[in-house]
Amino acid sequence: MTTTLSRPTDGEGSVQVQQDPSMKIEEGALVIAVYGKGGIGKSTTSSNLSAAFSKLGKRVLQIGCDPKHDSTFTLTHSMVPTVIDILEEVDFHSEELRPDDFVFTGYNGVKCVESGGPPAGTGCGGYVTGQTVKLLKEHHLLEDTDVVIFDVLGDVVCGGFAAPLQHANYCLIVTANDFDSIFAMNRIVQAIQAKAKNYKVRLGGVIANRSADTDQIDKFNERTGLRTMAHFKDVDAIRRSRLKKCTIFEMDDDDDAVKAVKNEYLRLAQNMLDNVEPLEAVSLKDREIFDLLGFD
């Protein structure tokens, strides 16, 4: 006798991480989850976008959701302790913690938190993200925040690391103009489609990064219903800002390329504040992407 396995709907099965209703982030805050292929520049993009929102006068909180805990170091100019490390120090008695123990103020007042994660091969990163949001709410740290940015590791869209999508209004996908990045982006679109059935998250658009051109991204956008919200070329000043452990907004204004990058981040931030029209994008099958991308 054969057994037919059916794909569970979102929220069914042990691999899914469900949001406690009490952990919902207050209405009014703009919550953005940033995803993309590993190494594509999500942390750089997230930190510079956080800085841009702060330049527009917004109160910003950035939450790094990667065990590497390197999301916010260009904002804080240091590698800050993670929530999971700090909780371990007090034997997970969160009531013993003060906000200053796990929230660090970075460039232009941006608040920074690194959730961290369990050791490799153990635990669930989504659980850690959930505990981070819980801790922030217990200390009423989300009530006076205008913008929350979740910077999520790699392109992992399992139940755990899809957890930030349960809190977000919009997902922004960082991609380059190449096959691997766009292939990963398609998987993220699939995750958004699944989460959007039960949560408020919607696709906000694409951020083209480290790419002189966007012809392949444009092809994918046209087929799926996505749009490019910002385009950052491979500017060496961005690489140097990481080495200097600072945001692009702290780099020399005399460089026209730096000015252009700053203006593009400010434009992106303002567009996100102006109530971006959510996208109803439709993902492609793997074979369709293979046939779509490339040159004739």
UniProtKB/Swiss-Prot annotation:
Cofactor(s) this protein requires: [4Fe-4S] cluster
SS bond list: none
Residues at which [4Fe-4S] cluster binds: C124, C158
An example molecular function term from Gene Ontology annotations: metal ion binding
Pathway(s) of this molecule: Porphyrin-containing compound metabolism; chlorophyll biosynthesis (light-independent)
Matching CDD domains: Bchl-like
Keyword terms of this UniProt record: 4Fe-4S, ATP-binding, Chlorophyll biosynthesis, Iron, Iron-sulfur, Magnesium, Metal-binding, Nucleotide-binding, Oxidoreductase, Photosynthesis
Binding site for Mg(2+): S43
Residue positions binding ATP: G39, I40, G41, K42, S43, T44, K68, N209, R210
EC numbers on record: 1.3.7.7
First-level EC class: oxidoreductase
Region (Disordered) residue spans: 1-20
Keyword Oxidoreductase: yes
InterPro entries the UniProt entry points to: NifH/chlL_CS, NifH/frxC, P-loop_NTPase, Protochlorophyllide_ATP-bd
Gene3D superfamilies found in the cross-reference section: P-loop containing nucleotide triphosphate hydrolases
Cofactor comment: Binds 1 [4Fe-4S] cluster per dimer.
Role according to the record: Component of the dark-operative protochlorophyllide reductase (DPOR) that uses Mg-ATP and reduced ferredoxin to reduce ring D of protochlorophyllide (Pchlide) to form chlorophyllide a (Chlide). This reaction is light-independent. The L component serves as a unique electron donor to the NB-component of the complex, and binds Mg-ATP.
Subunit structure: Homodimer. Protochlorophyllide reductase is composed of three subunits; ChlL, ChlN and ChlB.
Family: Belongs to the NifH/BchL/ChlL family.
UniProt protein name: Light-independent protochlorophyllide reductase iron-sulfur ATP-binding protein
Species this protein is from: Synechococcus sp. (strain CC9902)
Taxonomic lineage of the native organism: Bacteria, Bacillati, Cyanobacteriota, Cyanophyceae, Synechococcales
Encoding gene per record: chlL
